[in-house]
Amino acid sequence: MNIEIKKSIKPIKYEDAIKLLEERLLEINNGQKEDLIWILEHEEVYSAGTSYKEKEILNKDISLVKTNRGGKITYHGPGQLICYFVIDLKKRKKDIRKFITLIEETIIDSLSKFNIKTFGDPKNIGIWTDHKGKINKVAAIGVRVSKWIAYHGFAININNDLSKYKNIIPCGISDKGVINLKEIKDQDYKNLDEIIIETFSKNLEI
């Protein structure tokens, strides 16, 4: 099963990225294009998924983009690795829960290459780490499935501005924090994108 790998160097506007994903969704459904994995970085934006609530916005002055992905509200911006995808589950296993687990394993396995221990949480979607005795989210996941084609993706915090999360209740979870990789371990993460692509592609073929 062929997968197109796309990498964008310059930050991409959130709305432009979602438009491309939705166009690819239609093309895959019509048999015109192959699956897609897309690595990018966003311009600053707060995005709200289908289950967010107004009370999760602590600063009413922020600009908010509502989207049809699953999940609640989160922040995207420089220093964050975004991995979007459009994957036809009809060619694989038509099991949404297994696909979410596959995403979680992709992130966990990729970060383990940098000696960073992370884990999923059955009650709170995303990838977490225990840093100095506190549970913090290091990666957010948001997925939508249409006609058994999964799209949207996940975001890994590398060295982004964590103060931006003070304007919201990230992913609707108030009793846990948000962290980035640089705060966990100050090292070079420049090849994380390649590791993500390799691991994700391999997991999709299993």
UniProtKB/Swiss-Prot annotation:
The record marks 137 as: Lowers pKa of active site Cys. The active site is at residue 171. The gene is lipB. InterPro entries: aa-tRNA-synth_II/BPL/LPL (IPR045864), BPL_LPL_catalytic (IPR004143), Octanoyltransferase (IPR000544), Octanoyltransferase_CS (IPR020605). The lineage of its organism: Bacteria, Pseudomonadati, Pseudomonadota, Alphaproteobacteria, Candidatus Pelagibacterales. The keyword Ligase does not apply. One of its GO terms (cellular component) is cytoplasm. This is Octanoyltransferase. GO terms for biological process: protein modification process. It comes from Pelagibacter ubique (strain HTCC1062). It catalyses: octanoyl-[ACP] + L-lysyl-[protein] = N(6)-octanoyl-L-lysyl-[protein] + holo-[ACP] + H(+).
